[in-house]
């Protein structure tokens, strides 16, 4: 493992996946700062560019206010110096308060999110990632309300080379996940990744269903650890944040998977997610391949998004 906690392959994937974002609106932010004198007009323009990059108005104002304070405290004079400070500030704002808890027996990851955001493929990509990390992974087809969900997940499980536990349409999701955790424990698997229903038409039902699943996990394996990752589509930008806020009213997520980051020239919602939802981004999707889901690190993200190379101080 190399820089920022991941290897060259992951670093290259992040670099390639952020190409549109780096050369798009974030490129405009750098152009705004580079060669500029630090004054109120610059701060106003930077705030506007951050909003255009999908950071959102509230977060953009907060970032610029903090940048202004840091610039004044350190006596910085040039836009290039301010850009370096912005890099550090963004990394600080996105840093998680704790690592994922995956030391249970088994470690269980529930994956939640509305249909169409890349939830099923993210599950398979998680399975592939953790398998490559040496974990023995089993999948649970917990979305029993959508006819094609289990079949789709089965195809991806085959690609990832991991076993899948499923039941018929309309089966109790908590029972499916209970059986999976029991099976994993009996067969020596140390991780279960579970799909859940991708709908949000009734918050009370969803909340009750996820609470029941959580109880079933602990009943099946008292020593299990439990993480709940919410999948969001980066292309939808601020709409993803609004959608996530609604989902989080019904579900206690512990982290975010941000998919399709390679498909947007904005990408500012990565920053907004942590600020608006108080949830860390754990993984980002930077392509369609099964190995194109990579662990997110603020330092790695900022390094590729706002490179220092070639700047004069």
Segments from the language model and where they lie:
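Compositionally biased, low-structure terminal segments
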Residues: 5-7, 26, 302
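Short glycine-rich anion-binding loops that position phosphate/pyrophosphate groups of nucleotides
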Residues: 197-199
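Short, low-complexity, intrinsically disordered N-terminal peptides in bacterial proteins
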Residues: 1-2, 313
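Switch/coupling subdomain of P-loop NTPase systems
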Residues: 2, 9-13
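C-terminal effector/interaction modules appended to NTPase cores
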Residues: 2-3, 76
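Surface-exposed, interaction-prone regions with an acidic/low-complexity signature
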Residues: 4, 17, 251
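Conserved catalytic-core segment of NTP-binding enzymes
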Residues: 152, 172-187, 201-312
């Amino acid at each position: 493992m190399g820089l920022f906690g991941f290897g060259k392959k992951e670093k290259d994937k992040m670099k390639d996946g952020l190409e549109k974002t780096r050369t798009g609106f974030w490129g405009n932010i750098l152009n705004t700062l580079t060669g500029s004198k630090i004054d109120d007009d610059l701060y106003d323009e930077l705030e506007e560019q951050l909003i255009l990059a999908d950071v959102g108005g509230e977060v953009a104002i907060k970032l610029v206010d903090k940048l202004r304070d840091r610039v004044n405290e350190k006596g910085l004079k040039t836009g290039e110096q301010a850009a370096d400070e912005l890099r550090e500030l963004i990394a600080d704002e996105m840093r998680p308060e704790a690592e994922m808890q995956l030391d249970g027996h088994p470690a269980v990851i529930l994956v939640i999110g509305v249909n169409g955001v890349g939830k099923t493929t993210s599950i398979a990509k998680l399975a592939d990632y953790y398998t490559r990390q040496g974990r023995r992974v089993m999948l649970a087809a917990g979305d029993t309300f959508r006819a094609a969900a289990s079949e789709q997940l089965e195809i991806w499980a085959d690609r990832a080379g991991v076993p899948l536990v499923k039941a018929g349409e309309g089966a109790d999701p908590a029972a499916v996940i209970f059986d999976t955790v029991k099976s994993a424990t009996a067969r020596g698997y140390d991780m279960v990744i579970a799909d859940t229903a991708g709908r949000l038409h009734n918050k009370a039902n969803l909340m009750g269903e996820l609470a029941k699943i959580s109880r079933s996990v602990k009943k099946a394996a008292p020593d299990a650890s439990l993480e709940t990752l919410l999948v969001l589509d980066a292309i939808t930008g601020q709409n993803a944040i609004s959608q996530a806020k609604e989902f989080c009213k019904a579900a206690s997520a512990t982290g975010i998977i941000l998919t399709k980051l390679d498909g947007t020239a904005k990408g500012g919602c990565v920053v907004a997610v942590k600020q608006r939802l108080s949830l860390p981004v754990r993984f980002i999707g930077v392509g369609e391949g099964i190995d194109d889901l990579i662990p997110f690190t603020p330092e790695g993200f900022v390094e590729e998004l706002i490179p220092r190379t070639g700047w004069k101080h």
